[in-house]
Amino acid sequence: MPPPPHIKPENVLKRAQELIAVGQAPAALNVLHEHVTSKRTRSSPIASLEPVMLLFVELCVDLRKGKAAKDGLYQYKNIAQNTNVGTIEVVLKKFIELAEKKVTEAQAKADEIQSSLESAAPSSNVDDLEAIETPETILLATVSGEQSRDRTDRAVVTPWLKFLWETYRTVLEILKNNARLEVMYQTTALQAFQFCLKYTRKTEFRRLCELLRNHVQNAAKYSAQMHAINLSDPDTLQRHLDTRFQQLNVAVELELWQEAFRSIEDIHTLLSLSKRPAKNVMMANYYEKLARIFLVSENYLFHAAAFSRYYNLLRQSAAALAAGQGTKKENPSVTEADMTKAASFVLLSALSIPVISTSRSRGALVDVDEVRKNKNTRLTNLLGMASPPTRAVLFKDALNKGLLKRARPEIRDLYNILEVDFHPLSICKKITPILKQIGADPEMEKYVLPLQQVILTRLFQQLSQVYESVELKFVYELAQFPDPFQITPSMIEKFIMNGCKKGDLAIRVDHISGVLTFDTDVFSSAKALHPGSAAGSAESEVGSVQRLQNTPAEIARLQLTRLAKTLHVTCMYVDPSYNEARLQAKRAALARAEAGAAKEHEETLARRVIIEKKKEAATDALQRKQREEETRKRIRTQQLQEAEKQRLLDEHREREKKRIKDEQDRIRQQELKKQLEELKTGVKGIDISELDLNELDANRLRAMKLAQLEKEKNELNDRIRTTAKRIDHLERAFRREELKHVPEDYEKQKQRDMEIYEATKAEALKEAEDKHKEAVALKHRLSRLVPQFNSFRKEVSEKRHEEFEKRRKAAERDFEAKKMQRIKEVQERRRRERAEREEEERRRKEEEERIRREEEERTAKEEERRRVLAEEKAKREEERKRLDELAAKQKQREEEAEARRAARRTGGAEPEAAPERAAPTERTAPRLNLAPRTGGAGPSWRERQAAKEAAGGTPAAPAAAAPEPAREEPAPVRRTGGYVPPHLRSGASATPAAPAPAPSTERYVPRAMREAGSSQPPSRTQTPGSSSDKPEESKPAAGKWVPRWKQQQGGQ
């Protein structure tokens, strides 16, 4: 049953538009909200519900009702997501566009207000010039003197910015984890990122990142839901990666490094889930942003490692593009300048890695190694490296790839000064111009401070190898850097204290004497006491520091090692048996190792087989368990879906029943109210306040209305009758009094009309005279111009006539030319048509001739065919005649044989009488006696045939000859069936001289008729002559059927 008309979406939309037209937008929003969130709306068609939703979101944006919009959009998504996803996208896009438009309008309004305030400020009126600085103005200036723009934005723009942010968050919540709305979800997320970047909303950006992160985490949790996203799908994962890369770019632009690092972790997690390799252009962006993050966090080691990975990716992309194995869309476009810049940054970042640790805690004394190890492992995984990077490994990799040749010259010189030819006494002089060049580049300027730390570390390490103590002034002179990168003595002392705290330096500062003393106690070396102190350093290799000479501490520490080596060499030369014993022990160990290797190998193989079997068994059990679990889960899901479907169906039915009942009650109440209102407004005298709606019905209201209308009609008739009587008397009195004043009024009217006529006539005459005078004056003025006008008109006419003649002649020439061309065209066309007609006539004649020839050929063929058929027919006729003759001869022979057999049968009584040979008759095919024979009753067919032939006689015998007694013809057997002509129906009068020809065929006579024709049929041995004593003349002709009464008449 369709919903009632007043709850259709079209009617709701019309009602809302009417409320908006009268300025009641909140009421219209309430109407739309109630309709959208109603359960009845689920059965409405989407095509009629979409305009309602568009108007609904428009009103929500205008009135800033975010919560109402969220409720309505959630309901609309649940209704339309299974039928039409496009309409959801249309509504949500409209929602976002309206919110963005409101923000733009608010900004324009704020700019207008600010410009008006700025323009009005200089020209403001001051009441008292001596009291300009009142306490109120001072307080206002203190509080908001320079904040007028901010206050305007907070009052006008900020509420709409908040609403726009709520819009983005609402749309993302509606679209989350829905595979059918995934593209719209990603598009909205990108728009939200641009919103945060455009308006520098850092707090909202953090919340947005957390929101998207929660959505991805919940995707696996709700994977069993309908339309859930599948991160295993490559396209879905690619869209999420694109969104995260945009998130990373915006985080870097907003300088939210913590969020950028978390975005990097999100990207790494998604990349680990992806089955297809990421594009080189995406990974280049990934490593570039990761390098910037590490640089901001002052983690120069991983910053250099990220730049190294970035350079490797650029080199691979350039090689792929050069080989034609990739596209420019998937690989970043790289030029030679880009490669040089990247190589310079890789080398410079590697040089900026601190030689000693820059952290504030001491690794050997505080248990932070495990935490630092876990952190380094995480960062290594983000870079996709197998092991944590080190300074030496990065330099080795850079040298192997030839980065020194690609890098800029000043970077190459810097590498040679710091890593190849480091001289502490001239380091600052050599490096000053290089630092100036690096400082002039804004991108490289940030590496100056870590380079200074590396230079100071190298400086103090090599000074400690050469000197035991140096003056502070000497150190300050050595550590001179160019402006503006100059470092102060306090900075140098702070660096020394930090190195000593970490155990990387062993230096004492004596401010009284102004001397730096390097620790020379051979048993108190910080490195010797705390060998794990380098755990937190970026440099853990022993040979990384350039060794000018061994320090006393190293000499003391390595003394036992040198002594052991010397004694070992001495023993080898002094006692040869010592070397032999060593060799024998070595050979014995090798033999034992070889003997045990095979056994160990077999045990290893057996253990491997056992492990593989256990793994296979565990895998099979796990797969079986997973399949069983999936089966149970699928069955449970199906049961839940069926139960939910049944529950929804039952609820829908109950709701429909309740809705129909409620609608019927509501319609009835509305109809009653409508009738009461009509009764109240249309009929007077009825008090409806005392009526109860529950006790009323339509019939009672109709009766009340009719009764009241009848009452009013009677009252009206009475009033009309009374009023008409009063009006008649009054009108009669008025007319009687009026007759007295009519003549006087007529004379006055005539006088007024005459006066008006005279005034009008005088005015018309005066206007005519004035116009005449003006016309005469104008004629006198213009009469002086008549000669000039005539001459000018004559000249113009002559010129126009000459031009006309020229154009006429030209037109005639053109006409003649076109006429001749047309004549030629017509002649050509006629000639062509004539040729076509002749050609057509020729083709027609040829076609007729061909048809005539074909007809003649067909006729000849037909005549030939007829002739052939006639010849064949004649041949067939001759053949048929020949066959007929043969058949006649065969028949004659059969008849003769039959006659002989009959004669032999009849010759049993009188053997001496031999029957004469019957004349040959036309032979016919034998007839079969199909009637059954029982007990010898009735003659056989041979007997009947013989009787027939005997009854027929021979035509050659003379008619007057008397037959011999022995040759008396037997009485013919009565035959049935057969037509007797009228001239043969006389019976006894028929003469036997001209018997009728015997029929060539014999009809079948049923047994019953044969028995009915003769009560005592002749036996098989009875002769035809003994069956009847009647003369031959009284018998009918043989072969013809004679009725029984005819036979009886003939017998009589």
From Swiss-Prot:
One GO term in the molecular function aspect is: mRNA binding
Q: Which GO terms describe its cellular component?
A: cytoplasmic stress granule; eukaryotic 43S preinitiation complex; eukaryotic 48S preinitiation complex; eukaryotic translation initiation factor 3 complex, eIF3e; eukaryotic translation initiation factor 3 complex, eIF3m; multi-eIF complex
Start-end of Polar residues biased regions: 1013-1028
Q: Where in the cell is it found?
A: Cytoplasm
| UniProt feature, compositional bias: Basic and acidic residues | 617-632, 794-901
**Domain PCI: residue ranges:** 339-523
Supply the alphabetized keyword list: Coiled coil, Cytoplasm, Initiation factor, Protein biosynthesis, RNA-binding
Pfam families (alphabetical): eIF3a_PCI_TPR-like, PCI
Enumerate the InterPro entries for this protein. Answer: EIF3A, eIF3a_PCI_TPR-like, PCI_dom
Disordered, as annotated region? 617-646, 794-1052
One annotated GO biological process: formation of cytoplasmic translation initiation complex
Q: Which family does it belong to?
A: Belongs to the eIF-3 subunit A family.
| Primary role | RNA-binding component of the eukaryotic translation initiation factor 3 (eIF-3) complex, which is involved in protein synthesis of a specialized repertoire of mRNAs and, together with other initiation factors, stimulates binding of mRNA and methionyl-tRNAi to the 40S ribosome. The eIF-3 complex specifically targets and initiates translation of a subset of mRNAs involved in cell proliferation.
What is the name attached to this protein's record?
A: Eukaryotic translation initiation factor 3 subunit A
Q: Which organism is it from?
A: Aspergillus niger (strain ATCC MYA-4892 / CBS 513.88 / FGSC A1513)
